[in-house]
Regions:
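Helix-loop junctions at membrane interfaces in 12-TM secondary transporters
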Residues: 77-90, 273-284
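Helix-to-loop junctions at the C-terminal end of transmembrane segments
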Residues: 44-58, 141-142, 240-253, 339
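Cytoplasmic helix-loop-helix junction between adjacent transmembrane helices
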Residues: 91-125
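Structural signature of the two symmetry-related core transmembrane helices
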Residues: 61-75, 154, 256-271
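Helix-loop boundary and gating motifs at the non-cytosolic
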Residues: 1-39, 192-230
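A late C-terminal transmembrane helix in Major Facilitator Superfamily
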Residues: 313-342
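Symmetry-related core transmembrane helices of the 12-TM Major Facilitator Superfamily/SLC fold
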Residues: 148-166, 346-364
Length: 365
């Protein structure tokens, strides 16, 4: 239930939140800064909250309260229309919801280990609800009805808060105090640092798509309903990959998955810049199963293999903080500037980041 509700909310947030910001009058550069701010706050908040989760084991009440506060934050945002108030309230709201996913991922990964379950099969239900949200959102918000977006986020965050109460506490698996100093060698090892850099490069190559894909597609004549279909096709490809790879999760190594993701990203971004027809975009969106899905499964496989269970929330948090915090936080303002200056041609720049990751992974392999 957690994955179902959480990814339903972010099936609204990811494609349509920039649309709401655009329609209330923010420029692409300002939108880039607002989106980046939501990632920057991870750097400060996420490690602290993860440490609390590891040392107390009270993941249930902690995550429920944070998601409830996030709902309040979005309700406040509904009355704002200028950049600085929106930016500041976004920072506060993001401080509440950003730490939740890595904490819950660590709990679910540990549960999957104990119960001999496949993470990919569990995670795909989040992708299913993401598709429902993007398709339904495209229809609901079409024709200038973007004012509805924020209230769907408020209600959705509230439902996620309730679902957090259904997840077992970390203490029910094995409650152990974090020993960060003991595991400093792991987090500072060349392999772990290399993992963060290569996965980070793949991740930030999505910046123009995540921040401005909806705006770009609308600017070239596609309706919100069709744009919702574009996003849904990408996540449907994720589901297929999670299902297929999930059957062989223990046999498929993280290095192969990351190589697959980087190679697909190198091809995907320049082709999105070149082709703008509905059919072409639908076909190219199927590559999302590789550029995101394979990268995500590869990252989770690496963390499951190399990070001890007693600091799993901290390990997950460190990954999300650096990849989704520092990397994305630095990249999104640049993506806003690139999109403002280059429009769809900004995708060519994204391919360069994926190419650097691919070359590095090939050297390692």
């Amino acid at each position: 239930m957690f994955y179902a509700t959480y990814f339903f909310v972010f099936g609204i947030y990811m494609p349509y939140w920039p649309l709401w910001l655009n329609d209330i009058g923010l420029t692409p550069v300002e939108i880039g800064w607002v989106l980046a701010g939501a990632f920057w706050i991870k750097v400060v908040v996420q490690p602290v909250v993860a440490h609390v989760a590891d040392t107390t084991g009270r993941t249930k009440i902690l995550t429920a309260v944070l998601m409830g506060m996030s709902a309040i934050g979005f309700a406040i945002l509904s009355d704002l229309q200028s950049f600085w108030p929106i930016f500041l309230i976004t920072l506060i709201t993001a401080a509440c919801y950003q730490p939740v996913l890595p904490i819950m991922e660590s709990v679910i990964l540990n549960f999957a280990k104990i119960g001999n379950l496949r993470y990919g099969h569990i995670r795909l239900w989040g992708s299913v609800t993401f598709i429902i949200a993007t398709l339904g959102g495209g229809w609901l918000f079409d024709g200038g009805r973007s004012d509805r977006i924020i209230w769907f986020l408020v209600v959705g965050m509230t439902l996620v808060s309730l679902c957090c109460l259904l997840i077992p506490n970390q203490a029910q698996f094995e409650r152990t105090k974090s020993r960060i100093k003991t595991h400093a060698k792991l987090f500072l090892s060349p392999l772990f640092i290399f993992f963060l850099i290569t996965t980070g490069l793949i991740h930030i190559s999505h910046s123009v798509l995540y921040g401005f894909g909806t705006l770009y597609w609308r600017s070239i004549g596609h309706s919100e309903t069709i744009i919702g279909l574009f996003w849904s096709i990408g996540v449907l490809a994720e589901i297929v990959l999670f299902t297929v790879v999930g059957r062989h999760e223990k046999q498929v190594g993280y290095l192969f998955l990351l190589l697959l993701a980087a190679a697909a990203a190198v091809a995907r971004w320049p082709l999105l810049a070149i082709f703008d027809s509905q059919i072409a975009i639908i076909v190219l969106q199927t590559l999302h199963g590789f550029t995101f899905g394979a990268a995500h499964l590869g990252a989770m496989a690496f963390l499951t293999k190399h990070v001890p269970k007693e600091i799993s929330a901290t390990g997950q948090s460190l990954y999300y903080t650096l990849i989704g915090g520092i990397f994305s936080g630095c990249m999104l303002p640049l993506a806003g500037k690139l999109y403002s200056d280059l429009s769809g041609s900004a995708f060519f720049i994204m391919s360069c980041f994926a190419g650097c990751s691919l070359i590095s992974l090939l050297v390692l392999s």
